[in-house]
Design a protein with these regions (language model features):
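Short proline/glycine- and polar residue-rich coil/turn motifs
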Residues: 53, 93-103
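Bacterial N-terminal signal peptides that target proteins for export
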Residues: 2-15
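Bacterial N-terminal signal peptides
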Residues: 13-26
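C-terminal region of N-terminal signal peptides and the immediate post-cleavage residues
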Residues: 23-40
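Short glycine/proline/serine/threonine-rich loop/turn segments at secondary-structure transition edges
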Residues: 112-122
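Short beta-strand elements
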Residues: 132-147
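Short, surface-exposed binding/anchoring microloops in extracellular/periplasmic proteins
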Residues: 38-83
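Short aromatic-acidic-glycine turn motif
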Residues: 79-90, 130
Length: 147
């Protein structure tokens, strides 16, 4: 009887220790990924944007920070109320990653029937890229001034 009790207690202790170790290492995963040089992508829309060709396009400044290998794709969409309608546009650029904040200007051409005008607009920027192990993307939405 005593031998069976000792076996049960020993089994319970081992199970608790193994479970604790698994829980400890499982929660360390994201920290290990962060400190081991994983993929980092960040894009920030900046203001003001510059109106071009009587509203046919705007130049939108963005700040790009990344550590992807090769180049990353940065796309920007601008939406603005224009009279009784909506002006919209899209533009993109390929950017090399330098590891620190890099200023990039993206040309956004109006795609709707309405031209852009001076004033407030909503800009959405997305960055996407890959390193040797993984791919990812990040997005930023901002209200900007078009001047």
């Amino acid at each position: 009887m005593r031998t069976n009790l000792r076996i049960k207690v020993a089994t319970a202790v081992v199970a608790i220790l193994v479970g604790g170790l698994l829980a400890w290492f499982a929660t360390a995963g994201p920290a290990v990924a962060f400190f081991s040089g994983g993929l980092f992508l960040d894009v920030q829309v900046e203001s003001p944007a510059t109106l071009l060709a009587k509203g046919a396009a705007v130049q939108v400044p963005v700040e790009v920070t990344c550590n992807a290998t090769g180049t990353v794709s940065v796309s920007v969409t601008v939406t603005q109320k224009s009279g009784s309608g909506v002006a919209q546009g899209f533009g993109s650029a390929q950017v090399g990653c330098a590891g620190s904040g890099e200023q990039v200007t993206v040309l956004v051409q109006a795609t709707a029937a309405k031209p852009f005008k001076k004033g407030d607009a909503v800009a959405t920027a997305e960055i996407s890229g890959c390193n040797n192990l993984t791919c990812g993307s990040e997005t930023d939405n901002e209200v900007i001034q078009i001047k």
